Amino acid sequence: MDQLTALITTLNSYLWGNFCLVPLLCGAGLYFTLRLRFVQVRKFGLAVKYTFGQLSFSGAKAGKDGMSSFQALATAVAAQVGTGNVVGVATALTMGGPGALFWIWCAAFLGMATIFAEAVLAQTYKVRRPTGEITGGPAYYISEGLKCKPLAVFFSICIIIALGMVGNSVQSNSIAESFHLAFGVNQLLVGVILAVISGLVFFGGTARLASVTEKLVPIMAMCYIVGGLYILATHAGMIIPAFKMIIQGAFDPAAATGGIIGVTMKEAIRYGVARGLFANEAGMGSTPHRRRPPTRRSRDSSLSWASSSPRS
Protein backbone atom coordinates (compact mmCIF):
# COMPACT_ATOMS: atom_id res chain seq x y z
CA MET A 1 0.00 0.00 0.00
CA ASP A 2 2.86 2.39 0.80
CA GLN A 3 4.39 1.70 -2.62
CA LEU A 4 1.05 2.36 -4.33
CA THR A 5 0.65 5.61 -2.40
CA ALA A 6 4.17 6.67 -3.37
CA LEU A 7 3.48 5.87 -7.04
CA ILE A 8 0.23 7.85 -7.07
CA THR A 9 1.92 10.78 -5.32
CA THR A 10 4.72 10.80 -7.90
CA LEU A 11 2.30 10.65 -10.84
CA ASN A 12 0.15 13.36 -9.28
CA SER A 13 3.10 15.71 -8.80
CA TYR A 14 4.15 15.16 -12.42
CA LEU A 15 0.70 15.54 -13.99
CA TRP A 16 -0.19 18.62 -11.95
CA GLY A 17 3.32 20.06 -12.06
CA ASN A 18 4.61 23.08 -13.92
CA PHE A 19 4.74 21.62 -17.42
CA CYS A 20 1.75 19.30 -17.82
CA LEU A 21 -1.97 19.60 -17.08
CA VAL A 22 -2.12 23.05 -15.49
CA PRO A 23 -0.49 25.00 -18.37
CA LEU A 24 -2.06 22.70 -20.98
CA LEU A 25 -5.65 23.08 -19.76
CA CYS A 26 -5.30 26.77 -18.92
CA GLY A 27 -3.65 27.38 -22.28
CA ALA A 28 -6.47 25.60 -24.09
CA GLY A 29 -9.06 27.60 -22.15
CA LEU A 30 -7.29 30.87 -22.96
CA TYR A 31 -6.99 29.92 -26.64
CA PHE A 32 -10.70 29.08 -26.94
CA THR A 33 -11.64 32.22 -25.00
CA LEU A 34 -9.72 34.45 -27.41
CA ARG A 35 -10.52 32.44 -30.55
CA LEU A 36 -14.26 32.45 -29.76
CA ARG A 37 -14.14 36.12 -28.71
CA PHE A 38 -15.13 35.57 -25.07
CA VAL A 39 -18.13 33.41 -25.92
CA GLN A 40 -18.75 32.75 -22.20
CA VAL A 41 -19.49 36.46 -21.78
CA ARG A 42 -21.16 37.27 -25.11
CA LYS A 43 -23.60 34.35 -25.05
CA PHE A 44 -24.16 33.94 -21.31
CA GLY A 45 -27.59 35.58 -21.35
CA LEU A 46 -28.68 33.46 -24.31
CA ALA A 47 -27.52 30.30 -22.54
CA VAL A 48 -29.61 31.19 -19.49
CA LYS A 49 -32.63 31.87 -21.71
CA TYR A 50 -32.39 28.57 -23.59
CA THR A 51 -31.69 26.55 -20.46
CA PHE A 52 -34.13 27.86 -17.89
CA GLY A 53 -36.82 28.46 -20.48
CA GLN A 54 -37.45 24.72 -20.18
CA LEU A 55 -37.27 24.58 -16.38
CA SER A 56 -40.14 22.29 -15.39
CA PHE A 57 -40.67 19.25 -13.20
CA SER A 58 -43.08 17.87 -15.78
CA GLY A 59 -41.45 19.06 -18.98
CA ALA A 60 -40.26 17.21 -22.05
CA LYS A 61 -38.95 13.72 -21.37
CA ALA A 62 -35.76 12.31 -22.75
CA GLY A 63 -36.23 9.90 -25.60
CA LYS A 64 -34.47 8.87 -28.79
CA ASP A 65 -33.44 12.44 -29.52
CA GLY A 66 -31.75 12.86 -26.13
CA MET A 67 -32.52 15.51 -23.51
CA SER A 68 -34.10 18.91 -23.16
CA SER A 69 -31.79 21.86 -22.48
CA PHE A 70 -32.55 21.85 -18.76
CA GLN A 71 -32.17 18.07 -18.50
CA ALA A 72 -28.77 18.34 -20.18
CA LEU A 73 -27.72 21.08 -17.76
CA ALA A 74 -29.04 19.12 -14.77
CA THR A 75 -27.15 15.99 -15.84
CA ALA A 76 -23.94 17.95 -16.38
CA VAL A 77 -24.22 19.72 -13.01
CA ALA A 78 -25.04 16.42 -11.27
CA ALA A 79 -21.82 14.97 -12.67
CA GLN A 80 -19.67 18.02 -11.92
CA VAL A 81 -20.81 19.09 -8.45
CA GLY A 82 -19.44 16.84 -5.76
CA THR A 83 -16.51 16.35 -3.45
CA GLY A 84 -14.28 18.61 -5.53
CA ASN A 85 -16.57 21.60 -5.02
CA VAL A 86 -16.55 21.28 -1.22
CA VAL A 87 -13.51 19.33 -0.04
CA GLY A 88 -11.48 20.38 -3.09
CA VAL A 89 -11.89 24.07 -2.31
CA ALA A 90 -10.90 23.51 1.32
CA THR A 91 -7.84 21.55 0.17
CA ALA A 92 -6.84 24.31 -2.25
CA LEU A 93 -7.23 26.88 0.52
CA THR A 94 -5.09 24.82 2.90
CA MET A 95 -2.35 23.96 0.40
CA GLY A 96 -2.30 27.13 -1.70
CA GLY A 97 -3.54 29.81 0.67
CA PRO A 98 -6.44 32.25 0.09
CA GLY A 99 -5.07 33.18 -3.33
CA ALA A 100 -5.85 29.69 -4.62
CA LEU A 101 -9.53 30.67 -4.63
CA PHE A 102 -8.79 33.44 -7.14
CA TRP A 103 -7.15 30.96 -9.49
CA ILE A 104 -10.12 28.59 -9.07
CA TRP A 105 -12.32 31.40 -10.39
CA CYS A 106 -9.92 31.98 -13.29
CA ALA A 107 -9.99 28.27 -14.14
CA ALA A 108 -13.80 28.38 -14.09
CA PHE A 109 -13.91 31.34 -16.47
CA LEU A 110 -11.50 29.78 -18.98
CA GLY A 111 -13.16 26.39 -18.60
CA MET A 112 -16.47 27.75 -19.87
CA ALA A 113 -14.87 28.35 -23.28
CA THR A 114 -13.26 24.91 -23.23
CA ILE A 115 -16.51 23.12 -22.50
CA PHE A 116 -18.23 25.18 -25.21
CA ALA A 117 -15.69 23.91 -27.73
CA GLU A 118 -16.09 20.35 -26.40
CA ALA A 119 -19.84 20.48 -26.85
CA VAL A 120 -19.60 21.91 -30.39
CA LEU A 121 -17.36 19.02 -31.44
CA ALA A 122 -19.57 16.47 -29.69
CA GLN A 123 -22.64 17.85 -31.48
CA THR A 124 -20.90 17.84 -34.85
CA TYR A 125 -19.61 14.26 -34.70
CA LYS A 126 -22.36 12.40 -32.84
CA VAL A 127 -24.11 9.36 -34.30
CA ARG A 128 -27.32 7.40 -33.85
CA ARG A 129 -27.03 3.88 -32.43
CA PRO A 130 -28.95 0.90 -33.86
CA THR A 131 -31.29 1.23 -30.86
CA GLY A 132 -32.21 4.72 -32.01
CA GLU A 133 -30.43 6.61 -29.21
CA ILE A 134 -28.00 9.39 -30.11
CA THR A 135 -24.49 9.26 -28.70
CA GLY A 136 -21.30 11.25 -29.06
CA GLY A 137 -18.33 12.67 -27.24
CA PRO A 138 -14.55 12.97 -27.47
CA ALA A 139 -14.04 9.37 -28.60
CA TYR A 140 -16.19 10.06 -31.66
CA TYR A 141 -14.68 13.38 -32.68
CA ILE A 142 -11.16 12.11 -32.06
CA SER A 143 -11.89 9.12 -34.28
CA GLU A 144 -13.87 10.93 -36.99
CA GLY A 145 -12.45 14.46 -36.73
CA LEU A 146 -8.77 13.73 -36.14
CA LYS A 147 -8.99 10.38 -37.95
CA CYS A 148 -7.04 8.75 -35.13
CA LYS A 149 -8.83 5.66 -33.82
CA PRO A 150 -5.92 4.48 -31.61
CA LEU A 151 -6.04 7.80 -29.73
CA ALA A 152 -9.83 7.48 -29.44
CA VAL A 153 -9.45 3.99 -27.95
CA PHE A 154 -6.81 5.23 -25.51
CA PHE A 155 -9.05 8.12 -24.47
CA SER A 156 -12.00 5.75 -23.99
CA ILE A 157 -9.98 3.52 -21.69
CA CYS A 158 -8.79 6.50 -19.65
CA ILE A 159 -12.27 8.03 -19.34
CA ILE A 160 -13.76 4.68 -18.26
CA ILE A 161 -11.17 4.46 -15.50
CA ALA A 162 -11.60 8.11 -14.52
CA LEU A 163 -15.41 8.26 -14.49
CA GLY A 164 -16.29 4.63 -13.88
CA MET A 165 -13.77 3.86 -11.14
CA VAL A 166 -11.72 6.75 -9.76
CA GLY A 167 -14.39 9.45 -9.71
CA ASN A 168 -17.09 7.21 -8.29
CA SER A 169 -14.73 5.85 -5.65
CA VAL A 170 -13.88 9.34 -4.40
CA GLN A 171 -17.53 10.37 -4.18
CA SER A 172 -18.80 7.16 -2.58
CA ASN A 173 -15.91 7.07 -0.10
CA SER A 174 -16.65 10.63 0.98
CA ILE A 175 -20.35 9.83 1.47
CA ALA A 176 -19.61 6.62 3.39
CA GLU A 177 -17.05 8.33 5.64
CA SER A 178 -19.40 11.23 6.31
CA PHE A 179 -22.25 8.93 7.38
CA HIS A 180 -19.87 6.83 9.47
CA LEU A 181 -18.37 9.79 11.32
CA ALA A 182 -21.69 11.60 11.80
CA PHE A 183 -24.07 8.72 12.53
CA GLY A 184 -21.87 5.64 13.02
CA VAL A 185 -23.28 3.89 9.92
CA ASN A 186 -21.16 1.06 8.53
CA GLN A 187 -19.26 2.17 5.41
CA LEU A 188 -19.96 -1.09 3.55
CA LEU A 189 -23.70 -0.69 4.08
CA VAL A 190 -23.60 2.85 2.70
CA GLY A 191 -21.63 1.62 -0.30
CA VAL A 192 -24.14 -1.14 -1.06
CA ILE A 193 -27.08 1.28 -0.82
CA LEU A 194 -25.34 3.74 -3.14
CA ALA A 195 -24.57 0.98 -5.64
CA VAL A 196 -28.21 -0.21 -5.69
CA ILE A 197 -29.64 3.30 -6.14
CA SER A 198 -27.08 4.18 -8.82
CA GLY A 199 -27.79 0.91 -10.63
CA LEU A 200 -31.53 1.59 -10.71
CA VAL A 201 -30.86 4.94 -12.36
CA PHE A 202 -28.12 3.71 -14.68
CA PHE A 203 -30.01 0.73 -16.10
CA GLY A 204 -33.05 2.90 -16.74
CA GLY A 205 -31.22 4.51 -19.63
CA THR A 206 -31.10 8.13 -20.73
CA ALA A 207 -34.77 8.78 -20.01
CA ARG A 208 -34.55 7.77 -16.35
CA LEU A 209 -31.21 9.52 -15.86
CA ALA A 210 -32.62 12.77 -17.23
CA SER A 211 -35.83 12.41 -15.22
CA VAL A 212 -33.98 11.86 -11.94
CA THR A 213 -31.41 14.61 -12.39
CA GLU A 214 -33.92 17.28 -13.45
CA LYS A 215 -35.74 16.70 -10.14
CA LEU A 216 -32.77 16.23 -7.80
CA VAL A 217 -30.44 18.93 -9.13
CA PRO A 218 -32.75 21.91 -8.38
CA ILE A 219 -33.16 20.66 -4.80
CA MET A 220 -29.42 20.04 -4.48
CA ALA A 221 -28.61 23.44 -5.96
CA MET A 222 -31.08 25.18 -3.66
CA CYS A 223 -29.55 23.55 -0.55
CA TYR A 224 -26.07 24.44 -1.81
CA ILE A 225 -26.96 28.08 -2.47
CA VAL A 226 -29.03 28.57 0.69
CA GLY A 227 -26.24 27.06 2.78
CA GLY A 228 -23.71 29.40 1.18
CA LEU A 229 -25.93 32.45 1.67
CA TYR A 230 -26.49 31.51 5.31
CA ILE A 231 -22.75 31.36 5.93
CA LEU A 232 -22.27 34.72 4.21
CA ALA A 233 -25.11 36.29 6.20
CA THR A 234 -23.78 35.05 9.53
CA HIS A 235 -20.24 36.20 8.70
CA ALA A 236 -21.07 39.38 6.77
CA GLY A 237 -18.33 41.35 8.47
CA MET A 238 -15.67 39.02 7.07
CA ILE A 239 -16.69 39.27 3.40
CA ILE A 240 -14.60 42.34 2.47
CA PRO A 241 -11.49 41.18 4.41
CA ALA A 242 -11.83 37.74 2.81
CA PHE A 243 -11.89 39.24 -0.69
CA LYS A 244 -8.83 41.32 0.14
CA MET A 245 -6.98 38.21 1.31
CA ILE A 246 -7.99 36.30 -1.83
CA ILE A 247 -6.86 39.02 -4.26
CA GLN A 248 -3.67 39.75 -2.34
CA GLY A 249 -2.94 36.06 -1.87
CA ALA A 250 -3.27 35.40 -5.59
CA PHE A 251 -0.14 37.43 -6.30
CA ASP A 252 1.59 37.64 -2.90
CA PRO A 253 0.58 34.65 -0.73
CA ALA A 254 3.16 35.42 1.97
CA ALA A 255 1.75 38.92 2.50
CA ALA A 256 -1.84 37.66 2.65
CA THR A 257 -1.10 35.04 5.30
CA GLY A 258 1.77 36.71 7.08
CA GLY A 259 4.03 33.90 5.90
CA ILE A 260 2.27 31.44 8.22
CA ILE A 261 1.59 28.70 5.67
CA GLY A 262 4.67 29.42 3.58
CA VAL A 263 3.15 29.11 0.10
CA THR A 264 4.37 30.81 -3.06
CA MET A 265 2.44 32.29 -5.97
CA LYS A 266 3.32 29.21 -8.03
CA GLU A 267 1.73 26.94 -5.42
CA ALA A 268 -1.36 29.15 -5.20
CA ILE A 269 -1.83 28.87 -8.97
CA ARG A 270 -1.06 25.16 -9.02
CA TYR A 271 -3.51 24.15 -6.29
CA GLY A 272 -6.16 26.65 -7.35
CA VAL A 273 -6.21 25.61 -10.99
CA ALA A 274 -5.88 21.90 -10.21
CA ARG A 275 -8.79 21.88 -7.76
CA GLY A 276 -10.86 24.09 -10.05
CA LEU A 277 -10.43 21.76 -13.01
CA PHE A 278 -11.05 18.67 -10.86
CA ALA A 279 -14.29 20.17 -9.58
CA ASN A 280 -15.72 21.11 -12.98
CA GLU A 281 -14.39 18.50 -15.42
CA ALA A 282 -13.53 20.93 -18.23
CA GLY A 283 -11.48 19.10 -20.82
CA MET A 284 -13.02 15.68 -20.09
CA GLY A 285 -15.87 15.81 -22.60
CA SER A 286 -18.43 14.46 -20.14
CA THR A 287 -21.27 16.82 -21.16
CA PRO A 288 -24.62 15.30 -22.31
CA HIS A 289 -25.84 16.08 -25.81
CA ARG A 290 -28.95 16.25 -27.96
CA ARG A 291 -29.56 16.69 -31.69
CA ARG A 292 -29.85 20.47 -31.92
CA PRO A 293 -27.68 23.19 -33.47
CA PRO A 294 -24.17 22.68 -32.02
CA THR A 295 -23.73 26.23 -30.76
CA ARG A 296 -27.07 26.24 -28.94
CA ARG A 297 -26.33 23.05 -27.02
CA SER A 298 -22.82 24.29 -26.35
CA ARG A 299 -24.10 27.47 -24.71
CA ASP A 300 -26.19 25.32 -22.38
CA SER A 301 -23.16 23.16 -21.64
CA SER A 302 -20.90 26.10 -20.83
CA LEU A 303 -23.52 27.29 -18.33
CA SER A 304 -23.00 24.10 -16.32
CA TRP A 305 -19.39 25.20 -15.79
CA ALA A 306 -20.54 28.48 -14.25
CA SER A 307 -23.25 26.89 -12.11
CA SER A 308 -20.88 24.27 -10.70
CA SER A 309 -17.89 26.55 -10.19
CA PRO A 310 -16.56 26.17 -6.62
CA ARG A 311 -17.45 28.93 -4.21
CA SER A 312 -15.27 30.17 -1.39
PLM regions: where:
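N-terminal alpha-helical transmembrane segments of multi-pass membrane transport
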Residues: 1-78, 83, 93-100, 111
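Select transmembrane alpha-helical segments in multipass membrane proteins
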Residues: 22-27, 67-74, 148-162, 192-193, ...
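Membrane-interface loop-to-helix entry segments
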Residues: 24-28, 35-48, 174-179, 186-247
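Helix-loop-helix module between adjacent transmembrane segments
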Residues: 32-33, 107-132, 138-173, 177-202
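Alpha-helical membrane segments and immediately flanking helix-loop junctions
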Residues: 57-95, 121-139, 143, 157-160, ...
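Short alpha-helical transmembrane segments in multi-pass integral membrane proteins
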Residues: 118, 309-312
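Hydrophobic, small-residue-rich membrane helices and short re-entrant helix-turn-helix hairpins
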Residues: 138, 175, 201-218, 238-243, ...
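Membrane-embedded translocation segments of transport machinery
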Residues: 214, 219-287, 306-307
